[in-house]
Regions:
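Soluble catalytic domains of membrane acyltransferases
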Residues: 3-6, 11-167
Length: 167
C-alpha cells in the first residue's frame, strides 16, 4: 500500500522524532525477514518499525481488533490477526490458519513483524518480557513449505523511548 508507506515517511515523522538511532542495522535490506520486536508503547512501535524498513512489512495484530467494520481496513494495511491464549477461545486452530497466511507472506518475499512479548503494559517498564514461540513456529513452517530452498531471516528489534510519557 504505497499511500500508507509514504504517509508514514512524511517529514512529520522526522519532526516529531528528530533524534532516531538505529544500531547494528544490516548493510542490505532483506525480504523474507521476521522482525521480532518488544512492545513498550502500544501505537508507536509498529509505526516506527514500518517507517524505518523499506520492504513492505506485514503486521501480526491481536485478533480482537478485527471487527466486521474494521476488518477490511486492517487487511488493506497488511495486518494479520493473531489469537492469544489469554484472550480465550480456541486459539490453536485459528492460529494455524493465520500461521499459514504468514508463511505465504514470507514465501512471497515479504517481511513480517510480530511483537514477541504478546502484550503491552499499561505502565512503561524498561525491561523485556518473555518472548513467545510463535515467531519461530511461523519461520519453521515457512521454511518447510519451501523445502528449505530459500533463506528466511529473523531479526530482533528493540524499541526504547527516552520520554515515554510525552508521546
Amino acid at each position: 500500500f504505497p499511500l500508507r508507506r509514504s504517509a508514514i515517511r512524511t517529514d512529520a515523522f522526522r519532526i516529531c522524532y528528530p533524534r532516531r538511532k538505529m544500531v547494528n542495522t544490516p548493510r542490505e535490506l532483506f525480504g523474507r525477514t521476521i522482525y521480532v520486536a518488544n512492545h513498550p508503547a502500544s501505537f508507536m512501535d509498529p509505526l516506527v518499525i514500518a517507517a524505518l524498513r523499506r520492504p513492505i512489512v506485514f503486521f501480526m495484530t491481536r485478533a480482537d481488533v478485527f471487527t466486521p467494520i474494521s476488518k477490511p481496513f486492517l487487511w488493506a494495511c497488511q495486518m494479520l490477526p493473531i489469537y492469544r491464549q489469554h484472550d480465550g477461545g480456541d486459539t490453536k486452530s485459528k492460529n494455524n490458519e493465520v500461521f499459514k497466511r504468514a508463511s505465504n507472506v514470507l514465501k512471497g518475499g515479504r517481511s513480517l513483524l510480530i511483537f514477541g512479548e504478546g502484550f503491552t503494559d499499561d505502565v512503561f517498564i524498561r525491561r523485556l518480557k518473555p518472548v513467545k514461540k510463535g515467531a519461530a513456529k511461523i519461520g519453521f513452517e515457512a521454511l518447510e513449505s519451501i523445502n528449505w530452498s530459500k533463506k528466511i531471516y529473523m531479526a530482533g528489534v528493540g524499541s526504547n523511548y527516552s520520554r515515554p510519557n510525552q508521546m
